[in-house]
């Protein structure tokens, strides 16, 4: 997990009502690292004290043991799902990013299906939302 985000440039860009494009690279002792996009997004959300973080995946969101979408889940429930192998594989690093963000001030993280057209707009501008909301 990145330990420092230099967010001054991001804040300046956002103040100009522009959307920044971020290449998730990290530096340590003159060495460059490629950081997983979800991990970088979580670290940026924490550093900007964001209310919400949206992460995209190739699933509807977090699925229960019957493979049905869970619309809202708490951090403790997610940890239990990992323990019981309901959440596994590549979803675990994404969930860990969610949990880290939530435990560091982000109010909620939503995992949405990036394959569905307009899923982010649906999440932002509808009462029902899209995907899974993970909350503290």
Label every PLM stretch briefly.
Residues 1-136:
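C-terminal catalytic "cap/lid" subdomain
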């Amino acid at each position: 997990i990145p330990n420092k985000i230099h967010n001054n440039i991001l804040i300046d860009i956002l103040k100009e009502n522009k959307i920044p494009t971020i290449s998730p690279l990290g530096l340590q002792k003159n060495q460059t690292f490629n950081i997983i996009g979800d991990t970088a997004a979580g670290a940026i959300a924490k550093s900007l004290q964001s209310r919400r973080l949206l992460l995209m995946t190739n699933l509807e969101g977090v699925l229960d043991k019957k493979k049905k979408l869970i619309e809202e889940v708490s951090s403790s429930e997610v940890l239990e799902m990992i323990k019981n192998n309901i959440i596994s594989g590549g979803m675990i690093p994404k969930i860990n990013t969610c949990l880290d963000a939530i435990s560091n001030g982000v109010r909620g993280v939503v995992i949405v299906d990036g394959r569905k057209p307009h899923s982010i707009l649906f999440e932002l501008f509808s009462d029902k939302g899209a995907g899974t909301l993970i909350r503290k």
